[in-house]
């Protein structure tokens, strides 16, 4: 083992609004030594996801916040570099939750084996990981799409949205994506197979959406919030379903958005149109749905029915800048940090 220190990125202070590089700090500590029953893991890939922004706040949401000076949380794909646990062998690849650091100890609980030579190990953080599972559960169990439905997907080229749209097409939906910029919209249509994709930065976005969804919207997969939802709301059909996955446009907000209070309009639409709007946290669904997810998506990948794009950034030290860019929509595909080269 040539590396002698463990790099860690910790939460230096809590952001006020949008995160800045100064909210993070790179530290170096001794590489831990496994005790009996433990394994030493070395991360190779780190997943960066929007939910991490909420964990930087002081208040608890659905999970405890990251404490100041603690390692930032995150899913990882690691290799076992030393094992004192008979269930794991040196060199094995595992999915773990070791966060923004090079090395971590584990007693084996919660580790998911990928074998010795997985073809695409980083896929376990994306299309076959939490983002893919989020899309699968949110659309199929909450959105309940039917053939012929109009499905609108916010953040259509992101890790979750790109999967939602493609699964929707497999289920016979007419799929409309919403993304930022012409390049992403072109990718959604030409590569992912969306029927249409609209640029939410266009001045006439709301008018374009209304013209495109001339028969209304049956399922809206919400990843963004803000003005995109404002444009979607009046177009929702009677009995529409809205899986509420995320609100990335609001994660950095420090106050209520400007403008009139639209809560009564929202509640009125939900009442009159009998709209089903349901938030969900993916960790609640692993026991009942994960096996089917892996089986279905693995088959779709093998058959070429699902396309997947990674935005790979080299170097753990670049994680803060990449994460800040993620919240600004600068990534194109699933954002993954390659922290180290495989052993």
Positions of PLM-derived features:
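Short glycine-centered segments of the SAM/dcSAM-binding site in methyltransferase folds
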Residues: 93, 150, 174, 240-241, ...
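Glycine-rich phosphate-binding loop and adjacent beta-alpha segment
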Residues: 227-306, 339-343
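NAD(P)H dinucleotide-binding glycine-rich loop of Rossmann-like/cofactor-binding domains
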Residues: 72-79, 86-155
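Glycine-rich beta-strand-centered segment in the early N-terminal region that forms part
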Residues: 30-48, 56-100
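Mid-domain Rossmann-like dinucleotide-binding core that forms the NAD(H)/NADP(H) cofactor-binding site
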Residues: 125-203
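Short amphipathic alpha-helix with an adjacent loop that forms part of the alpha/beta core around
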Residues: 204-214
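Short, glycine/polar-rich helix-capping loops at beta-to-alpha or helix-loop-helix junctions
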Residues: 101-102, 180-190, 262-267
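C-terminal capping/lid region of NAD(P)-dependent oxidoreductase domains
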Residues: 3-6, 303-312, 320-343
